[in-house]
């Protein structure tokens, strides 16, 4: 065993071995993998080996596409047969909403180049003659999909890694990990290995590995069962006749998958009541472990399978597998850098580990070696969770994620387990006013407010649902009167010290506000020149700055700041998120409202746009910042959390005759789209330069060096491939752009809608999207696919609502 290596990968399942393979493939041969038992002996060995390309995420979809393409080439590269059966995958639909989901997904597939076909029930019967098509309204098929032999795949990846110089140490247990000045020391029962990087691919042991370095990795496995039957005469006969294998069948509404296996069938349900396992970790001797089967949990799905595939009832059960599958609260894996640690990487929480292994290894190897991934990895970022993700929280959320694998994934879906958790002081007041809540980063946020006797409950859909009218009312009130929005979930911090200005000037691409009290919108780029973070920065004093960013990215943004911050004490960081609340007042009557609750001067002459003042609202101290995300006159009121209800009550009382009403996140989204305001993770991404995203006025390449400048200049010399535009979508009836909709010209995909909504102030359906630069001209006619229907679209000037910002500046 080596005593020194560039990278130590911990864990020898498909994910870990793929990690090793991709590091070696990119040229790092001095890499090793440590496995406590044998390769695949955790969860990989009992995996059903399915390779679903279906994923509603633009980024995760690219990872899955890469993996499937890679697996097709491994036998030629390594000489190892991976048992890849390209038999296609059919997903059945019994409801209109399910077909809407498939059409939305098909749009995503078009933007990343994945082939998907829509089938009629009769076509399903032709491909899957054992399927009862009663009650079906259609299906989708992935012709390139199928299944693979998980253990064989892992061995092929291991061969590919070894052929490039990587080494694998089996039956070697990691007993400790220590950080050093130069990197890490991994302690094993066979000796120690000094290294620069550590990658945790420990699967069911993820939490134990994390504990060795002080990390609480938000992963707990859940039990998953599948049934293998005896051979069925009809399937055996088909094989003898040389007929093609029927492929993978997924009854999404029945919540199960089925495929052929050795002349019989495999049935894998995602049932209610499946418990988390290994809450305190597997035993030290755990290897090739299965749990006692529990067929009672599966009976509703078994009976559903009897109906959909009557042949399933005609054969006996050969074997029931009940093994651990890793889960996270949202069901997506955790791939990327650990927070607060240098060169410690996480590749954990893979509930679809065989599918994800290839893509996760590919992108994480890029991240480690090149410093950044190519694909925006926000959907799988380890830093998308915070300290609120405790073990008890994970247990509830992970069990929820498991049972929801096959539910319809609506764009406005808000899952209920382990909520409410983090609440602003005004939560109960908002609730009494009709708030229907969602959550981000554990925080409860009002999505909208129920009106006119509407049930105080969400109504999920891919189309305009019951909340559409409520949001319309909120938007119009903001336009005509004044609205109140709770944004306490914002991430907030203070950067101070004698070198605070120098540090921040290097961190962001915009110039910092020069005068005390002034505010600038600033963007932090990554080292490849893509947009990493967006901050509202207010100068508090000569050497102190207040930063605000999206609440969902609190850990990500704050970790990014700390990564670049000097450790010599000349710059200090203070997280203010949990101590500072934020209420936003916006609308033409906002100034009158503020004059009623405060004695300070709110005139345009003495309180200009993009400035702030320390004021009092009632008896409470408030940092009033004249900025908002909806394009109206307004202020963000930042205040010590303990004063929030006092401020809230003062505002509501004073605003009665002004028409003051609360509004929610969905109204805010409609209002921001009309202004062409951009969001990190959609319009702003590491995949796009700030120039492509229309941030030209916020980028100052001549101000001096900043993170990403060199790469950005090279990118500009090379030429940009995209341009963000605002479009009006025509002939809309009941569905607006949701994001990831393909944009067409002359039948060819020329772009991707990043987001959209109905703009109630404009009475137009609006989309934001990336298109080829040569098409990004006002008046250009294009088409957008919305739930399978083509709609004409016209490119508008940026910020179609109040393009000169007269209202903001009034």
List each model region and its residues.
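Flavin-dependent oxidoreductases
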Residues: 18, 177-292, 300-308, 393-414, ...
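Glycine/proline-enriched, intrinsically flexible loops and inter-domain linkers
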Residues: 375-376, 382-810
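Central beta-strand plus flanking loop segment that forms part of the substrate or channel wall
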Residues: 48-53, 88-91, 214-241, 300, ...
